Design a protein with these regions (language model features):
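Histidine-acidic metal/acid-base catalytic patches
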Residues: 17-20, 64, 72, 86-192
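Active-site acidic/histidine proton-transfer and metal-coordination neighborhood
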Residues: 1-105
Length: 192
């Protein structure tokens, strides 16, 4: 089902002229709720009887089924660091490196590394085709990260990143004031 959905999204992206889509590794589905998952910093118990090795195998198998559509359409799948097996740069890079295709790269979400964030940005930046820059004005719903966007911009410059920077606002402040502040913050950092 997820493979079919991803292929449909690749085809829709092609029809709309969108060069990349965000994909993720999925989760084990063992948390009671997303709130519970966030309380555990995105770490979720495995399904009983299965290992991370099983999970990585399923992820690889799924993406390999999507590769022909991505190549045919010229749409890159950007694997986001987003919980589950993709919670760390090492997990995302393991999938990317094992598949070893120009049609599977990374979507770097600055708000999804809850530990050693700058070291993980540095690891993932060379594979990034899209960056989702999170801001938390007014405090975040589940957590708030202090992100030094001047430092992030420097990491991306060193990796020769030339793609889009997408704002992802997750704060509680009214969007009418927070989004302009967020855009100004990002413009200052990335135009330096």
């Amino acid at each position: 089902r997820n493979v079919d959905h991803t292929i449909k999204c690749i085809e829709l992206a092609y029809a709309l002229g969108i060069p990349t889509i965000r994909v993720n590794t999925g989760r084990w589905g063992t948390s009671k709720s997303f709130d519970d998952l966030m309380a555990k910093k995105g770490i979720e118990p495995r399904l009983e009887g299965y290992t991370d090795e099983d999970g990585f195998g399923w992820v690889q198998e799924g993406f390999e089924k999507c590769l022909p559509a991505a190549e045919r359409c010229g749409v890159v799948m950007g694997l986001e660091n987003h919980w589950g097996l993709g919670r760390t740069a090492a997990g995302v890079l393991r999938v990317i490196n094992e598949i070893d295709s120009p049609w599977l790269r990374a979507t770097l979400d600055t708000g999804n590394f809850l530990e050693d964030q700058y070291a993980q940005y540095e690891q993932l930046a060379p594979e990034a085709v899209l960056v989702q820059a999170k801001t938390y004005y007014g405090g975040g719903t589940w957590y708030t990260l202090e992100i030094d966007y001047d430092r992030v911009a420097e990491i991306l410059r060193r990796a020769n990143y030339r793609g889009y920077i997408s704002l992802e606002f997750e704060g509680k402040e009214d969007h009418q004031t927070a989004v302009p502040k967020s855009l100004e913050l990002l413009r200052r950092a990335f135009n330096a």
